[in-house]
Swiss-Prot record:
The gene is obg. GTP binds at residues 166-173, 191-195, 213-216, 283-286, 312-314. Its cofactor is Mg(2+). This is GTPase Obg. It comes from Citrifermentans bemidjiense (strain ATCC BAA-1014 / DSM 16622 / JCM 12645 / Bem). The keyword Secreted does not apply. An essential GTPase which binds GTP, GDP and possibly (p)ppGpp with moderate affinity, with high nucleotide exchange rates and a fairly low GTP hydrolysis rate. Plays a role in control of the cell cycle, stress response, ribosome biogenesis and in those bacteria that undergo differentiation, in morphogenesis control. The keyword GTP-binding applies.
Length: 338
């Protein structure tokens, strides 16, 4: 499956313009000296963060990007114009890697950050530059330097304060739709969410935070199983994680075993992920048998000092308390002091 969070493109900076071989041609000056101008510099390739972008879709549609070539030098000591600079706009959070080696070239995590990815070639010198006392009429000039070219891979890591994770179909999309403006596709089958989506949650006193609905994970995700490690990377920059459990399938499915399986995948992919703050959220608490099943799993989490919030994405039960806890973890102060 394909997601607009990763793209491979070819980028090339501009070639430098050639220097000119020219001699003065003026009336009454039969032996005019060299007057060939220099070639223009090739255009650089610059990558810059734009606050107006949220995907890499445009680059996927235009995989070949090229800066302008420098113009050739001209007679009468006229220099060629520099090639136009190519400015590639990307969303905040884009990581740029060499497509062949995997080397990280840039991590554009800050707003308005930018970098020169490739330098344009220098323009060649015209023959006027090579005139000496012993060589007054040079009939040669320098060619322009070629620009640089490389294949790069861009990866967009979602910038979110809170990440939702859990097995497929535990209710992550329903929760984010309930508490934010996001409207992810929702249905009763696995892997409904085929790409990560962001929702802005408006909290009290005009405060807000961003929540990422990460598609359902399964065992083996760290090795690419299911929708694979392409989703795990989106959790790396979230400040905290909400781990959703669905108790409605007990005893056919073991929610504690699923919880442990996902945490193993987090640790295998990146040990720091397993250390992130996690809050366990039990969805569908409006169903009577889920309330009964909650009593069975609570001791496991209480022994480990892990908070459990029973909520219902359908009715809204428990959601205000959950949002208060998220806000406290994000901003570290009680709501009354804001």
């Amino acid at each position: 499956m394909s997601f607009i969070d990763e793209v491979k493109i070819n980028v090339k900076s501009g070639d430098g313009g050639a220097g000119c071989v020219s001699f003065r041609r003026e009336k009454f000056i039969p032996l005019g000296g060299p007057d060939g101008g220099d070639g223009g510099k090739g255009g650089d390739v610059i990558v810059k963060v734009s606050s107006h972008l949220s995907t890499l879709l445009d680059l996927r549609q235009h995989p070949h990007q090229k800066a302008g070539r420098g113009k050739n030098g001209m007679g009468s000591d006229r220099h060629g114009a520099n090639g136009h600079t190519l400015e590639i706009l990307v969303p905040q959070g884009t990581v740029i890697k060499d497509a062949e080696t995997g080397e990280i070239l840039a991590d554009l995590a800050e707003p308005d950050s930018s970098m020169v990815l490739l330098k344009g070639g220098r323009g060649g010198q015209g023959n006027a530059r090579f005139k000496t006392a012993t060589h007054k009429a040079p009939k040669f000039a320098q060619p322009g330097e070629p620009g640089e070219e490389r294949w790069i891979r861009m990866e967009l890591k979602l910038m979110a304060d809170v990440g939702l994770l859990g097995m497929p179909s535990v209710g992550k999309s329903s929760l984010i739709a309930k508490i934010s403006a996001a409207r992810p596709k929702i249905a009763e089958y696995h892997f409904t969410t085929l790409k990560p989506s962001l929702g802005v949650v408006q909290y009290k006193n005009y405060r807000s935070f961003v929540m990422a609905d990460i598609p359902g994970l399964i065992e083996g995700a760290s090795e690419g199983a299911g929708l694979g490690h392409r989703f795990l990377k989106h959790l790396e920059r979230t400040g905290q994680l909400l781990h959703l459990l669905d108790l409605s399938w007990m005893p056919d499915r073991d929610p504690i075993a699923e919880y442990e399986a996902i945490n193993r995948e987090l640790a295998l992919f990146n040990p720091e992920l397993a250390d992130k703050r996690q809050t366990v959220v039990v969805n569908k608490i409006d169903l009577p048998h889920v309330r009964e099943n909650l009593k069975e799993i609570l001791p496991y989490f209480e022994e480990r000092g892990i908070k459990v919030f029973p909520i219902s994405a359908a009715t809204g039960e428990g959601i205000p308390e959950l949002l208060d806890d998220i806000a406290f973890n994000l901003w570290g102060e009680p709501e009354e002091t804001w």
